[in-house]
A protein has these predicted regions:
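Acidic, serine/threonine-rich low-complexity disordered tracts
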Residues: 20-104, 141-237
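Sec/Tat signal peptide C-region and signal peptidase I cleavage site
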Residues: 15-19
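Hydrophobic, well-structured mid-protein blocks that either form specific transmembrane helices
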Residues: 95-141
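Sec-dependent N-terminal signal peptides
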Residues: 4-13
Length: 237
């Protein structure tokens, strides 16, 4: 369940396609862990700040477990640039806190993961563990079919690969939504985990659903309950 909360924080290489603009949104989700008699909720939002930066927030809770995640982002020349990233998990297993600053001037990512210092060289296009989800959402909306992101994970940098599977209709509490199914690409010899996401074909490409299957067969799902994009309610048919 802890990994599920982490992931729910936890959400295509066609050079000719321009990535989508940023659209402020807010969404709430139901969260279920199939092998356990419990359910939870999650909220995700993107808002524009007075200084032109953007704030991406995520909150999730399931019984006694909770998780919050916040990224402050610059959007410059069609590129997402993290400024800061905070993460806090409590109530289940080991508590965890992360605070990172992305300094474009010094080309450094500095901060702490719990008590461990972080000092990583900031490469072009590098993202945090929340901002990459927004990049994925934008790239899917732009029509890209496969993509890779370099993501700071504590003192390390990992590569996240994704591919588009195709269009599907998803039944939600706001109706049937035309969505695009995406999955994370992993080396099957290294991990049997399955991660699948459905993004709305329209309506800003908002995340509609997520499915995660762990190596032990446990399955975690979130499903859109309601949401807005550019102040307009997300609607299905």
């Amino acid at each position: 369940m802890r990994r599920a909360l982490l992931f729910a924080v936890a959400l295509f290489a066609l050079p000719a396609v321009q990535a989508a603009d940023l659209h402020p949104f807010s969404a709430s989700y139901t969260a279920d862990w199939k092998q356990l008699p419990m359910s939870g909720s999650a909220e995700r939002s993107l808002t524009k700040n007075d200084n032109g930066s953007w704030t991406l927030n995520f909150k999730a809770s399931m019984m006694i477990a909770s998780l919050t995640e916040t990224s402050v982002i610059l959007f410059d020349k069609d590129t997402l640039q993290p400024k800061s990233y905070t993460f806090e998990r409590g109530g289940l297993g080991k508590a965890k806190k992360i605070n990172l600053d992305f300094d474009q001037a010094t080309k450094k990512v500095t901060g702490f993961e719990n008590k461990d210092p972080v000092n990583v060289a900031l490469q072009s296009g590098m993202l945090d563990k929340s901002t990459y989800q927004l990049a994925l959402q934008r790239d899917v909306a732009a029509g890209k079919k496969s993509m890779s992101y370099n993501v700071v994970e504590g003192t390390d940098v990992d590569t996240y690969d994704f591919r588009v599977i195709g269009p599907e209709k998803v039944q939600t509490k706001v109706g049937s939504i035309d969505a695009i199914k995406v999955e994370r690409v992993r080396d099957p010899t290294q991990s049997k985990r399955i991660t699948q996401m459905w993004f709305a074909k329209d309506q800003g490409g908002i995340l509609v659903a997520l499915r995660q299957v762990e190596t032990d067969g446990k399955e975690y799902n979130i499903m859109l309950q309601d949401g807005t994009v550019d102040g307009k309610a997300v609607k299905g048919s």
